Design a protein with these regions (language model features):
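Sec-dependent N-terminal signal peptides
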Residues: 1-2
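Short amphipathic
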Residues: 59-65, 134-136
Length: 200
């Protein structure tokens, strides 16, 4: 049987005699474990076998963090960590790390808490099914990329050092500690979302 999934609802508070809407009010309702503190018992019974399997995976501890890692511009521990992971993951494609790792701040949806790191916490930080993409770019294109990052007041990066003014102007940049050469080819490890031209 078919059904509906409501992703957005509004309540018509005011109508005319002909039922024409003249006023609408709305508010955000976060659908999470706090909102659903008292789930339907029958539904919970049906879902339990699947929930148990998912929980077993999500609660698996895969590492530890000695500190809270937050996200934010111009850079942060978490954004730099994720960019560094992408840079190192390029070994699978290149046989060596990429010259640069890049992730957008908007793609990071949570912080990494101090203590044990679970699979579920990684999914909360990176909830989208993004794939690793390794791009090869000329130095001239890299400079345009760096200017774009500067105009956003920073993104998650690794393998490079940038100096950005408070106004979002690129002041200086190096790749692997070296100046950017216009005709040289560089590799950038990022996510498919950005590689496809999305993001700000």
């Amino acid at each position: 049987a078919g059904g509906f999934l409501f992703t957005s609802c509004r309540s018509a508070r005011e109508t005319t005699a002909n039922y024409e809407v003249v006023g609408v009010k709305g508010s955000m309702i976060t659908i999470d474990s706090v909102w659903d503190a008292n789930p339907d018992k029958r539904a919970a019974e049906i879902l339990k076998p699947y929930k148990d399997k998912v929980d077993a995976m999500m609660y698996e501890v895969i590492g530890t963090s000695e500190m809270i890692m937050d996200k934010g511009n111009p850079e942060s521990l978490l954004s730099n960590l994720v960019a560094g992971v992408l840079q190192q993951a390029a070994v699978r494609v290149l046989g060596k790390p990429a010259d640069m790792g890049l992730v957008n701040m908007g793609g990071l949806r949570n912080i990494l808490p101090k203590g044990d790191i679970t699979v579920g916490e990684i999914f909360e930080i990176l909830p989208f099914e993004n794939s690793l993409c390794v791009l090869t770019m000329k130095g001239t294109d890299m400079k345009r990329l760096f200017k774009a990052i500067a105009s956003l007041h920073g993104e998650g990066v690794s393998g490079i050092r940038m100096e950005i003014s408070k106004e979002g102007e690129l002041l200086n940049v190096t790749i692997g500690g070296q100046p950017v050469k216009d005709d040289q080819s560089y590799t950038v490890a990022t996510i498919d979302y950005l590689a496809d031209g999305n993001g700000r």
